[in-house]
Amino acid sequence: MHNIIEINNIVDWLKYRSKGIGGSDAACILGRNPHKSNLDLWREKTGRKIPEDISNKDVVKYGKNAEEPLRQLFILDYPQYIVKYSPFNIHCNKELDFIRGTFDAELIEILTEEQGIWECKTSEIRQASDWQKWHNRIPDNYFCQVLHYFAIDEDYKFCKLKAQLKHYDLDSNEITLTTKHYHLKRDDYLPDIEYLINEEIKFNWYIKNDKEPPLILPVM
């Protein structure tokens, strides 16, 4: 079981989210976010740095606007799941309240009654290395996010991640869309979840004690 902060607007959501460690923060803490280091994150959490507003970036707006249609497609393609969606609710670990997150949806598998998480990602494929990040795996920063959500509550037994990959063909001037689904089982990653929890406990200590953590260079 875990605690839920029930919120119905974006302003309150941003306020409560900033007080803890969210899903997108996990990769920064482990040095797996190519765009932000753990030190950048610490400076934001301690008020030394204003987080960059990325809400008006085209890729961010696309991902936000695409989420609901992709969620509805998932519901059509996977009728074996009950899908629950609360856009602003913040889910918090019962004992470690700073470990928190807002899910793209919660799932219940009808046959087994197991609880899970649904996560949605959109990504542009611009070069061959971008394909490799999605080949039989998910990118490291998204994997850290899934582990973080597993850390919120051990009752979440799986995560279904839906990825829509967009590729521009310069020769034909056409867009190709590739949809991938990944099923991640909690029990397959127990050591990774425990490791992440310990690292987030350490990072939270640096925040609470206003101590600068050692820099972890992001993996590019």
What are these regions (language model features)?
Residues M1-N65, P69:
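Charged, glycine-rich intrinsically disordered N-terminal tails and low-complexity linkers that flank
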Residues A66, D97-R100, I138-Q145:
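Short, glycine/acidic-rich beta->alpha junctions
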Residues P69-D77, H148, I152:
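Amphipathic alpha-helical segments that form well-ordered structural scaffolds
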Residues F74, F103-D130, Y149:
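Conserved catalytic cores of phosphodiester-cleaving nucleases, focusing on short active-site segments
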Residues I75-D97, D104:
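A short acidic/basic microdomain associated with nuclease active sites
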Residues I82-Y85, I117-E119, F158-A163:
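A structural signal for short, well-ordered beta-strand segments and their strand-loop junctions
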Residues F98-R100, E113-I117, T176-H181:
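Short, mixed charged/polar active-site loops
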Residues D130-F143, H148-M220:
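Metal-dependent nuclease catalytic regions and adjoining charged, substrate-binding loops involved
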